[in-house]
Amino acid sequence: MPISGRPIKEAIAEGKRIVKTLSAAHPNWEIINPLDISAGLPKEVWDLPERKRYAAFMGADIEALLGEADAVAFTMGALVSKGCRLEICLANIYNLPRIFLNAADKVSRVEGTDMALCIELRKEINQE
C-alpha cells in the first residue's frame, strides 16, 4: 500500500480497511500491515530526519517481509510507489507469491514461482 506523499491518517485508515476486508474474506490468513510494524518502532525513530525515518520504516518492513511473510499483497497504486516496488522486487528475489488487489480490496491475481503455494492461494481465492 503506498504510504509516502499522503496524509498519514488516510494511509492508516486504508491499511485498517484492507486488513479488515482481507481478514473477512480469508480468515486463515495472518495479515501484517506495514503501518502496524512502523507503529511498533522505538519513539526515537519518529524524531529522525525524514530520510532516516523512512529508512527505518522500510528496514522494519523488509525484516517482517523476509522473516514472517509467506506472500505479499499489493494494493492499487503499488507500481508508482518506491516502497511497494522495492517490496515487489524482494518478493520476486525470495520467491514469495505476489497477491494483487483491485480497487475493491479483492484479490485480482496471484503471481510467483513457488507454484505449490501459488496454486494453494489461487484455490483459496477461487482463481483456478
Residue ranges of model-derived segments:
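Conserved catalytic or regulatory cores that recognize and/or transform ribose-phosphate-containing ligands
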Residues: 1-128
